[in-house]
Amino acid sequence: MSTILESLPTGQKVGIAFSGGLDTSAALHWMKLKGAVPYAYTANLGQPDEDDYDAIPKRALEYGAAGARLIDCRAQLVAEGIAALQSGAFHITTAGVTYFNTTPIGRAVTGTMLVAAMKEDGVNIWGDGSTYKGNDIERFYRYGLLVNPDLKIYKPWLDQTFIDELGGRAEMSEFMRQSGFAYKMSAEKAYSTDSNLLGATHEAKDLESLESGIKIVNPIMGVAFWRDDVKIAAEEVTVRFEAGQPVALNGVEFKDQVELLLEANRIGGRHGLGMSDQIENRIIEAKSRGIYEAPGLALLYIAYERLVTGIHNEDTIEQYRENGRRLGRLLYQGRWFDPQAIMLRETAQRWVARAITGEVKIELRRGNDYSILSTKSPNLTYQPERLSMEKVASTFSPRDRIGQLTMRNLDITDTRDKLRVYTQVGLLTPGEASALPQIKGDSGE
């Protein structure tokens, strides 16, 4: 039997992830009028563009919900965000600028915590506002069924009856007005925004065109650093980690990591730090484009990565980066709690993050322009005296280096022989005008 219901299950409890926006408000009221028993569940993810969370469940009750709950997801969201940071679970980058997977992290938390709350209320049918072309429909599907194997999925936006009756925002707004609710449709923006405490995503509409750039976006977590009229003063900030956990900013210790991240957002946001423009592959392999904000995570990541490179050896760092990219893809695909993801994450947290103790001082300027001013850690393996060009007691002598270089003759000879073979079989065409090495046979030809 399919877990996806294509028509409204009348007479049954249906949980809906309720944001309080037009789409979910109209869907909830429509389900009530059509004979379902809707329950509303709102996730408090610390969205920077949400002013009054307590009012959202109240509105759901007004629109016909049989029950409405506000679930505080902030602590879990930050915990998962720091876990992603510790394991470098970020696979989307452009020219060294990173997308911090803030929406996928938010979906992992929302999808599990809301369905767990529904299960407590005996609600085994779940709906949300994700569309069939996006990533979220699959992410929520996976996370929901992980938590509740008996879960059925009903999405109004996959129900043709709902689409025929309320196919667009104008129709939904008129539907709410005719139902007696003074619901005023918000002004249309040139793009769509989704946010949580970790970051914001701006996409769709005008941003679907690659001829539209970051300048059409109005940041909600920082400043428009590209505008000449936005004054941004350089600022020095220190970030301290202990055993892989961020614990202090500018010497102020935080016992609550939610509060620490909020302060990191304020600091980074003053400079527009962590904004990026990315073209990515959705789960279904089609490409999409997004403008992202993540000022706090970006600030923490600069300090964390600096300590990683100063503490760990090259092979460990290589594994951390390779596994981080793999883990980032799994996170993006809605597999954050799959066994293979847990294995990669736990490995990084145990063998990389636990050694990360220290303090980094950073100068922030505009956007992603910054300088690292100092790095301190009791665990640093960076020892400049080993390689000092001054006359100091050395860990090895000139004769030691002569011996090491002499041993390199073996692989240099092997490389020369292989290049000769490639030339003989026509893979290389050496010549004076070629950038390839000049390979001569034994005869000197």
UniProtKB/Swiss-Prot annotation:
ATP binds at residues 17-25, 43, 129, 131, 136, 194. L-citrulline binds at residues 99, 135, 139, 192, 201, 203, 280. Pathway: Amino-acid biosynthesis; L-arginine biosynthesis; L-arginine from L-ornithine and carbamoyl phosphate: step 2/3. The keyword Transcription regulation does not apply. One of its GO terms (cellular component) is cytoplasm. Gene3D superfamilies: 1.10.287.400, Argininosuccinate synthetase, chain A, domain 2, HUPs. L-aspartate binds at residues 131, 135-136. It catalyses: L-citrulline + L-aspartate + ATP = 2-(N(omega)-L-arginino)succinate + AMP + diphosphate + H(+). GO terms for biological process: argininosuccinate metabolic process; L-arginine biosynthetic process; urea cycle. One of its GO terms (molecular function) is ATP binding. Signal peptide: none annotated. Its EC number is 6.3.4.5. Keywords: Amino-acid biosynthesis, Arginine biosynthesis, ATP-binding, Cytoplasm, Ligase, Nucleotide-binding. Its main location: cytoplasm. The keyword Nucleotide-binding applies. It is found in: Cytoplasm. Belongs to the argininosuccinate synthase family. Type 2 subfamily. Homotetramer. This is Argininosuccinate synthase. It comes from Burkholderia multivorans (strain ATCC 17616 / 249). The gene is argG.
